[in-house]
Amino acid sequence: MTEKLFYEDSHRTEFTAKVISCEEAKDGYRVVLDQTVFFPEGGGQYADTGVLGTVNVTDVHEKDDVIYHYTTEPLEVGSIVTGKINWEERFEKMQQHTGEHIVSGIVHERFGYNNVGFHLGADYCTMDFDGTISKEQLKEIEAAANEAVYQDLEIEILYPSKDELKDMDYRSKIEIEGQVRIVKIPGYDVCACCAPHVKTTGEIGAVKLVSMANYKGGERITMLCGRRAMRDYEKKDAMTKEISALLCAKEYEVADAVGKLKDEQTRMKSQIAELQQKLLEFRVAEIPVEEKIVTVFDSALSGNLAREMMNRLLDKGAVICAVFAGTDTDGYRYVIGSRSEDVRPISKALNVAFEGRGGGKPEMVQGSVKGTGKAMKELLMQYK
């Protein structure tokens, strides 16, 4: 059994311990100490990292009350080592985890929903609830959670007896055997939890509920607390300032500026489409259709316009029409059609000769090819 020093003081970062065992493991070694500050993976929270002496600790697991430290190098059995956890990583995780307890407690109290899933990753934290939450309710939850932070409430850790536990109203996702550890945030939450937490709610700094999505009939909320929330704000603030400068708009008016830009883009697309149609009409009018196969190469045609040009030239009287959009450098997209001929052999010939892909029905084929327009025209001459 490993003595769990992280339960005595969640802010403790260094300790000394005796090496009980050291065994080879996948990608390193598995070390057992008589006591540790390293928290193993559990309760939805991933394990601490750090060092034992000069050896890196990459992961920590627990089984049958024994904590296993996975290291990059071996440690001598019986030796005394000094361990140190990555404090910034631990503190950030505690900020997220205690923030999750507050939010889950508020949701449970106000709406009666249970937290049915929790993931604390390296970059974000998600909570799954078994009921639906509106955008307005999400704002209310966030405001209430931050009110708990402002109150700087002391986090209470309780180890109730079985009799005390029977009379205690607390949240728990699973049935727990043995001693139950309760994390209590006065006025907000009482929950069974095995992970270390901050000492007061003020240490969380801030709670930001950044997104919400429907998930398995309920809601999945993504949250950032403390330092993570600050980094997220700094990144978004920098982006807002950059967009503000690009649009020559005040920071709090960038959404309106983007909306105007989008409207302008829609108008321009409409005007471009009208001009493309007029240009297409001029192009079709000047292309002769006396030959059996009419071939058109144009670098500016989109897929829809290429198909429309083909149909218009067929309407004009072309027996077979092949339209190529692209360049010798970038390759070509082609569409070939006919009202009376099977054009699939032409597609097959192009694909073989020019590393092409594509096909279709007897009356129309589409695809892409690589090569020069000159060489493609020479191949198509065979069908005149």
Task: Kindly give the residue locations of the regions a language model identified.
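A glycine- and charged-residue-rich anion-binding loop/surface
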Residues: M1-K384
